[in-house]
Regions:
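Residues at the C-termini of beta-strands that transition into short coil/loop
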Residues: 173-176, 189, 246
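Residue-level recognition of the N-termini of beta-strands and the immediately preceding loop/turn
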Residues: 27, 169-170, 217-219, 240
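Short, surface-exposed connector motifs at secondary-structure boundaries
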Residues: 134-143, 212-217, 238-239
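Conserved Lys-Pro-Asp/Glu-containing loop-to-beta segment of HAD-superfamily phosphomonoesterases
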Residues: 193-234
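Acidic, Mg2+-coordinating phosphoryl-transfer loop and its flanking beta/alpha structural elements
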Residues: 145-152, 218-256
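Alpha-helical substrate-recognition element adjacent to the catalytic core
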Residues: 1-181, 256
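Short, surface-exposed amphipathic charged segments that create phosphate/polyanion-binding patches used
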Residues: 182-194
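Amphipathic coiled-coil/heptad-repeat helices and related helical stalk/stem segments
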Residues: 12, 129, 205-206, 225-228, ...
Length: 256
């Protein structure tokens, strides 16, 4: 496979052997969402995330779109620049999403917007992901998604519903909105999850999810940024296989 790069083939074969020997009941999947389980390009057009669709399509208002784009233009280059220290990037991401959530709520984000974005937007499930989800479901292998999605866990739930793949073995750890009786966003629960603090988003802090995976020590980790590796922080795994999707900054990410 010309598009597949295995850094250490001998090490990979040993880990694969341990996965096989342990069996399916010792495996769980830990995955990012945007551009990991979704496509990076659709019809030749680059996609970013569900929240980027909200900016792009004026679902709320032109004022929101303008302000949100200004935030993205300022902070996204910092997000993907691995030459900037982790602490600086973490601080910048926290600033970005604190401001963005305040903007979303002030601008009138409604739960109905999530359904519109997923129904009408260009974000699509990654090729092969449906088959993976079916396999995991059929063999009762837990899939834990840790996502910094700006539209939160509700949007991921609706996305999988669209593809009829919101299975009971899928567990989502993401930002959580509180909605009023009319579906308007009132606040986002703390702590805010962003791409740079997944090392602080420890699965043990979610006991209902942790009990499903605590004895499944062989972990397959899926992500599209260097920082996604931090999702496994705090989990006492036996064997870890990491799969990274090189969506952008390919040379820098390969060196890392």
């Amino acid at each position: 496979m010309p598009d597949l790069l295995i850094v250490n083939k001998e090490n990979f074969e040993e880990k694969k052997k341990q996965f096989i020997e342990g069996g399916l009941n010792k495996i769980h999947i830990l995955s990012d969402f945007d551009r990991t389980l979704t496509k990076t390009f659709v019809n030749g057009e680059k996609t970013l995330s569900l929240i980027s669709e909200l900016r792009r399509r004026n679902y709320i208002s032109e004022d929101y779109t303008k302000a949100a784009r200004a935030l993205a233009d300022k902070y996204h280059p910092i997000e993907i620049n691995t030459s900037i220290s982790s602490s600086e990037r973490k601080k910048a991401m926290n600033e970005w999403w604190t401001k963005h959530f305040e903007l979303l709520i002030k601008s009138g984000l409604n739960k109905k917007h999530l359904g519109q974005i997923i129904k009408e937007g260009i974000i699509q499930i990654r090729e092969g992901a449906s088959e993976l989800l079916d396999f995991l479901h059929n063999h009762n292998i837990p899939l834990v998604i840790i996502s910094s999605a700006g539209l939160g866990s509700d949007s991921i739930f609706i996305f999988f519903q669209k593809y009829k793949r919101m299975y009971k073995n899928i567990y989502i750890i993401s930002n959580v909105y509180e909605w009023d009786k009319n579906g308007n966003a009132k606040r986002v629960k703390e702590p805010i999850i962003h791409c740079m603090n997944k090392d602080e988003t420890v699965v043990k802090d979610y006991p209902q999810i942790f009990k499903k995976i605590k004895d499944r020590k062989n972990v397959l980790l899926l992500g599209d940024t260097i920082d996604d590796v931090d999702m496994v922080t705090g989990f006492d795994y036996k064997t870890l296989i990491k799969i990274g999707f090189l969506n952008e900054n390919i040379e820098a990410n390969l060196k890392a």
